[in-house]
UniProtKB/Swiss-Prot annotation:
Source organism per UniProt: Shewanella woodyi (strain ATCC 51908 / MS32)
Residues that bind 4-imidazolone-5-propanoate: R82, Y145, H178, Q246, S323
UniProt keywords, alphabetically: Cytoplasm, Histidine metabolism, Hydrolase, Iron, Metal-binding, Zinc
Binding site for Fe(3+): H73, H75, H243, D318
Protein name: Imidazolonepropionase
Signal among keywords: no
């Protein structure tokens, strides 16, 4: 066999559902890479013969290899911060009260409208580096802090440029319907028209988005407005997803599922009818414990119902300046378990296999199997559960992206 690299003295948490062991685990494993893809993975004793003299051999010292982590919901391209609102919330103001008073998303919109693409790129690069150091190899980045055509395009251009200049794969999502801008506060339908008839065609013309998202909530867009935007996006050939049931149950998840959404996100107030709709459509449920924690929410997502109806659960950081300024995927693994009572295996699946499904890239990443992209991490852990159990001790030893060692 002729391979580009071989890894031995490792255990592999493949996350491959066809492997019956928890985590898809292979103890005392070997993994071979060829042309940026996994060429072989399995028990070391079954490793085919290869040219030891000409093949780089990496020894994992008994550590664990997992798929590269996937953060499937972020807003990491933005300017400014909202530390002042953090203080207000601690003094008793709610997220909704701050938003209605012109704070929240709108304050970040002002900063983003004023920032240059170069400034936004540098800010985004630093945040992407932080995620990459924790083993993230694929990330989704949303717009939504422009709320006018020029700034929405600017944010998406920056996200695309980050993907071109960083080893982390970037999937972009157009979230023009994130909030109602001040200039349209008395004409929400007019703003929805702008999103559909001006912003969306401009985004498509520059090939700036892989998907379209909407914030469906009482303080944002109602069901009818949301459906208009998602239908237009679907008709244009883009994937669709939705912020839904975060603060109340408007039925957005059921509507999005009927349209074939890749995921619905937040879903603290999702009911069983909505869960059943997700199950029937194959739509993923994206859990965002960072926002739940930071906003000090008490309504938990319906984890038991999602399990009962076998809805794929995704775990993501929701990194953003207002409700989850927590740029750490490993922290989300811990929070997913401690706050939402996920098992460590469910949490890891939520940042690998299921996250890939939510982004429509499950044929490329998310599990370690022959033919998949060689995106994986070596961890200094004795069991995969440690990734969720412990935090902050620097257990990510090495990251391989497309067969290239990018972090050591």
């Amino acid at each position: 066999m002729s391979w580009d690299q071989v890894w031995i003295d490792v255990n592999v948490a493949s996350m491959d559902p066809s492997v019956s062991a928890p985590y898809g685990a292979i103890i005392d494993a070997a993994l071979a890479v060829k042309d940026g893809k996994i060429a072989w993975v399995g028990p070391r004793g079954e490793l085919p013969e290869f040219d030891v003299m000409s093949t780089p051999l990496y020894r994992g010292k008994g550590g664990w290899i997992t798929p590269g982590l996937i953060d499937a919901h972020t807003h990491l391209v933005f300017a400014g911060n909202r530390a002042n609102e953090f203080e207000k919330r601690l003094q008793g103001a709610s997220y909704e009260e701050i938003a209605r008073s012109g704070g929240g998303i709108i304050s970040t919109v002002k900063a983003c409208r004023e920032a240059s693409e170069a400034e936004l790129f540098e800010l985004g690069r630093k945040r992407l580096n932080a995620l990459a150091k924790e083993g993230v190899t694929t990330v989704e980045i949303k717009s939504g802090y422009g709320l006018d055509t020029a700034t929405e395009l600017k944010l998406l251009r920056v996200a695309r440029e980050l993907g071109k200049h960083h080893h982390v794969d970037v999937k972009t999502t157009f979230l023009g319907a994130h909030a109602i801008p001040p200039e349209y506060k008395d004409d929400v339908e007019g703003y929805v028209d702008l999103v559909i008839n001006e912003m969306l065609p401009a985004v498509i013309a520059e090939d700036l988005a892989d998907a379209v998202d909407v914030f469906c909530e009482n303080i944002a867009f109602n069901i009818e407005q949301t459906e208009r935007v998602l239908t237009a996006a679907k008709d244009a050939g883009l994937d669709i997803k939705l912020h839904a049931e975060q603060l109340s149950n408007l039925g957005g998840s059921t509507m999005a599922a009927k349209l074939g959404a890749k995921s619905v996100d937040h879903i603290e107030y999702l009911d069983e009818d909505g869960v059943v709709a997700l199950s029937k459509s194959g739509t993923c449920a994206t859990l965002l414990p960072g926002a739940f924690y930071f906003l000090r929410e008490t309504q938990m997502p319906p984890i038991d119902l999602l399990r009962k109806h076998k809805v794929p659960m995704v775990l993501a950081s929701d990194y953003n300046p207002g409700s989850s300024p927590l740029c750490s995927s490993l922290l989300m693994l811990n929070m997913g378990c401690t706050l939402f009572r996920l098992t460590p295996e469910e949490a890891l699946a939520g940042m690998t296999r299921n996250a890939a499904k939510a982004l429509g890239v499950e044929d490329k990443v998310g599990v370690l199997a022959a033919g998949m992209q060689a995106d994986f991490c070596l961890w200094d852990i004795s069991t995969p559960a440690e990734l969720a159990y412990s935090y902050g001790v620097g257990v990510c030893l090495e990251v391989v992206k497309d067969g290239h060692l990018v972090h050591q």
